[in-house]
A protein has these predicted regions:
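N-terminal strand-loop element at the rim of the active site
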Residues: 11-18, 30-80, 241-245, 289
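Membrane-proximal helix-turn-helix segments that form the acceptor-binding/catalytic region
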Residues: 107-112, 136-156
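Nucleotide-sugar donor phosphate/pyrophosphate-binding loop at the beta->alpha transition
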Residues: 119, 127-148, 187-189
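Donor nucleotide-sugar binding/catalytic pocket of nucleotide-sugar-dependent glycosyltransferases
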Residues: 151-199, 203-208
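Conserved catalytic-core segment of nucleotide-activated headgroup transferases in glycan assembly
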Residues: 186-248, 263
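Conserved active-site histidine-acidic residue motif and adjacent donor-binding/catalytic loop
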Residues: 241-242, 255-271, 287
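Acidic donor-binding loop of glycosyltransferase active sites
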Residues: 270-285, 299
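A charged, aromatic-enriched C-terminal amphipathic alpha-helix characteristic of glycosyltransferases
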Residues: 327-368
């Protein structure tokens, strides 16, 4: 039990908006309340968000105009001993990914309350893209804002080792040890699962946002067909906002397109399926809540692409299967149960309960000085 009463969490958006960072923040708030009796008050920083004044017993304030003054005023309503947890992703707080108002407001607040404790979870550092996109030209400003944030923050956390290294560099010596915590499942973590995949339905799940699932159908149908044949898949379950291009079959295997579903329904489906498929940049799997869900539910995670390096503790062939349609790679050496077990064990090292403990230690950091 903690004597810390309230955390002020700044987020871009919360449900009912579909927002991965908002889901992450809400799941973390639930766990902080469950494990440590810590209450969270949310400040929604996206002025276009539409939602209620509270969610699941957590109160919500909203920045109705992207103004540093308004942010300072809202933060000043709370006792300066209440730590602030910023969930940072530039595009969440400004259209072009450069929330100058947010950084300016936090700087002013820190000037007024120098002993206050600011912990920043960097979900992103800066965007990048081709030279004809605004992200390319604005990435310098985005990095400058991120650097300012690292210097304002008492502690920093992020989801990738690469990001942790960047934070160490741009903070110019302030943060020499930055925790990196791969994201947790936004669909919860099951209390019990069948001990063996053979006890589950021969079902494969394709889950996530429209863009990620559309990429599977646009680029990976041959691989998916190969997977279905090799694993004797009887049904593919497509979960999420309809893509508009989802086929009815992959080979002879029917696709059941069930649309958006509540978390408890998705949880039931994952717990009784054998595999989860994605076509994701393998260097960024630690940031994928979908990959996290596949691992948490002890499915066989399958990704259309693999990385030759071990990144964030994730190794192709050990923690996920990368099918090779040019050869039968389900010989004697292939054990899907072992890969499922390895991915599950990797996930448990940073599951939601463990992460909440780390966040609490950082949020309490100011009280320990």
């Amino acid at each position: 039990m903690s004597n810390l009463a309230t955390v002020i969490a700044i987020v871009p958006r919360l449900p009912p908006a579909i927002d991965g960072v908002g889901d992450y923040a809400l799941n973390l708030a639930r766990q902080l309340r469950k494990d440590f009796n810590i209450q969270t008050h949310f400040i929604v920083g996206n002025s276009t968000w539409q939602g209620a004044a509270e969610i699941e017993g957590f109160t919500i304030s909203q920045i109705t105009d992207n103004s540093a003054n308004i942010l300072v005023n809202v933060l000043s309503n709370y006792h300066s001993s209440s730590p602030v947890l910023l969930h940072y992703v530039g595009y969440g707080y400004a259209k072009r990914g450069c929330p100058v108002w947010l950084v300016d407001g936090l700087q002013r607040w820190k000037g007024l309350y120098p002993k206050s404790n600011l912990v920043t979870m960097f979900h992103e550092i800066s965007a990048s893209g081709p030279p004809w996109t605004s992200a390319f030209w604005l990435s310098s400003l985005q990095k400058d804002l991120a650097a300012q944030l690292t210097k304002l923050s008492d502690r920093c956390i992020t989801s990738k080792q690469l990001y942790a290294n960047i934070i160490t560099e741009i903070s110019q010596g302030k943060h020499n040890q930055v925790a990196f915590l791969p994201v947790f499942s936004n669909i919860g973590e099951p209390d019990q699962l069948p001990s063996d995949l053979s006890e589950r339905q021969q079902r494969l799940v394709i889950f996530g946002g429209v863009a990620n699932r559309a990429r599977v159908y646009n680029q990976s149908q041959r691989i998916l067909d190969y997977v279905c044949q090799r694993l004797n898949i009887q049904e593919i379950c497509d979960i999420g906002t309809p893509t508009g291009i989802t086929p009815s079959f992959i080979g002879k295997v029917p696709i059941l397109e069930i649309g958006e579903q509540p978390a408890n329904k998705v949880s039931d489906i994952l717990a009784n399926s054998i595999a989860g498929f994605s076509d994701y940049n393998p260097d960024f799997l630690a940031k994928s809540t979908i990959f996290a869900a596949y691992c948490a539910y002890r499915l066989l995670p399958i990704n259309a692409k693999g990385s030759v390096a071990i990144i964030d503790g994730i190794e192709a062939g050990k923690h996920y299967w990368v099918p090779d349609i040019n050869r039968n790679d389900l010989g004697d050496q292939f054990n899907w149960q072992t890969i499922a077990d390895n991915s599950f064990d990797w996930y448990q090292k940073h599951n939601l309960s463990r992460q909440s403990s780390i966040f609490v230690s950082y949020l309490l950091h100011g009280d320990l000085n």
